[in-house]
Amino acid sequence: MVLTHLHADHCGGGVVKAGAGSGYRLTFPNAIYHASRAQWDWAVKNNPREEDAFLEENILPIMESGHLSLVDEECELFDGFSVRLCYGHTPGLMIPVIKYKDKTLVYTGDLIPTAAHIPLIWNMSYDIESLRTIDEKKSLLEEALSNNYILVFQHDESAECCTLEMTDKGIRAKEKFGFADINPPTGAVEKV
């Protein structure tokens, strides 16, 4: 289980109520939960800007379970699955980069939550360091454009994924599509 960061909407499903007022338990009791150390330290220290985003019941049971693995630096967690660290949205946000068949998918998390957030200055008001977010987005978008990566969005209802193109206004979404359309199953009917 890879937790991009510890805001409630990104880690809240990692635990469930244990029942009869007995606290919480892991949703996936056999899984290792990966989070960045920078994000973990930031979340448990808490701060007035994000105090409503970090809920103890979402994160403390993970630590108490002994199933928490803290990531200190950008690395490959599994074969073909690496994480990058960003600090603009919240310190230690992990961006998964996944090699899948002949493609590279980048799960943008809250660095680029929707296709509408691709323009550099279109960011979330929730970002802790907005200018750093812009720099991190610029770097990721340029790399993704140069290497034909597929971006996968956390919060976009109409575009789960997209490819990129350079326009006269900068890097923008080229093709938008659903996650299932990345590599449809053999024998799938092609959409017209």
PLM region spans:
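Metallo-beta-lactamase
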Residues: 1-9, 19-85, 132-149
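Metal-dependent catalytic neighborhoods of phosphoester/phosphodiester hydrolases
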Residues: 12-23, 163-164
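Short amphipathic alpha-helices and their capping/turn segments at secondary-structure boundaries
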Residues: 22-26, 95-102
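Active-site-proximal beta-strand elements of phosphoester/diester hydrolases
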Residues: 81-87, 105-110
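Short active-site segment of divalent metal-dependent hydrolases/proteases
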Residues: 8, 12, 92, 113
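Divalent metal-coordination and catalytic microenvironments
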Residues: 5, 33, 86, 96, ...
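Cap/insert and terminal regions of metallo-dependent hydrolase folds
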Residues: 101-192
